[in-house]
Amino acid sequence: MNFPLIRQQPWYPGQMGVPGSDVSRGLRTQPNGIVLFVDGNHPNATTTADGTDPNNPLSTITAAMAKLVAFHALSEVQAEGSTIVIAPGTYTDSIAIDRTSYPPDCSIIGCGNSKFDVVWVPAAGDALSIDQSGWLIDGIHFQPAADGAGVKLTWNAGAGAEDTIIQNCFFDGRWGTGLYGVEFEGAPANCTIQDCRFAEFDTAQPCITITATPTASPYQTHILRNTFQEAVEYITIEAGGFNASIIAGNHFVQATGDLGATTTYINLGTGSLGYNQVVGNYFDGDYSNTGGYTAETNGNDNWVGNFAADVAEAEVGDNGITVAEPAA
């Protein structure tokens, strides 16, 4: 495997002990950190490989994470900024990134000829649970298990998965088999979900959800330029709500009914603050609370400037532009 496409490349040059690392192939994105390569299909791949050479990669994501934890134990500062590069293939790992064992500001990058080449499908539980700050997840095709999320972001008592970026990923509900796409548990702040695709999640199995708010609600979340289609519930809440967040440039498509009709496009819940900006999106279906669009209950959200197909509503102009929050 030659790792034909590495998003935000490159990281390989300049590692100690790697033959040919003095060859100029571009600039690193971080002054610190190591790069670990995972390729379950490579003939040289093992769980005990060094992993810093793409020709001698690790065979599982779990093995790469164990290497990163060991490096972090040796040098907390130098471990920051490390990257896990995953080659095309199917991976069944279930990973929990905690604040004690793992460094902040690291990346998990899927490489290949499209964003769908790296398939992460755990047998059970969350594919990836993050309780550390500043991680970047890019280019992964998540197929969540029946009892877990593709990516779960946690935060409680002032610490957790703040500043996470999830981009260029496909959250595939597998026609109702997967539980959640992205799950917020608690209130990680300043998280970004952008340029992703969500599809095929069933009733009570939403694409993006908040399941618990022990201290607060997700704050300054950015949900940008994503596509939501063929699911019953898109962005919803089981606890709390979104605060001071931006939902912009997304495309919400009414399901064709293979799983069921879309019942929830956006429900921002009952958080303590509100002030969410929901602008510049395309809204399919019935632009109303009954149709599945619900602003935060404090009444201070801004929903002006979306395009909605439902021009019959008083909150939608004749040109299809929303002029107010959705109403009953």
Regions found by a protein language model. Name each.
Residues 2-63, 307-311, 327-328:
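Right-handed parallel beta-helix/beta-solenoid
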Residues 18, 38, 86, 93, ...:
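Extracellular beta-strand solenoids
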Residues 36-41, 59-92, 106-112:
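Glycine-rich repeat segments that build the extracellular carbohydrate-interaction surface of secreted
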Residues 62-77, 91-101, 126-130, 152-156, ...:
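Short, T/G/N/S-enriched strand-turn elements that build extracellular solenoid repeat scaffolds
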Residues 79, 100-104, 123, 132-133, ...:
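Parallel beta-helix/beta-solenoid
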Residues 94, 103-152, 173-175, 201-202:
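Right-handed parallel beta-helix/beta-spiral solenoid domain characteristic of secreted/periplasmic
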Residues 170-231, 235-238, 242, 247, ...:
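Solenoidal tandem-repeat scaffolds enriched in leucines and small polar residues
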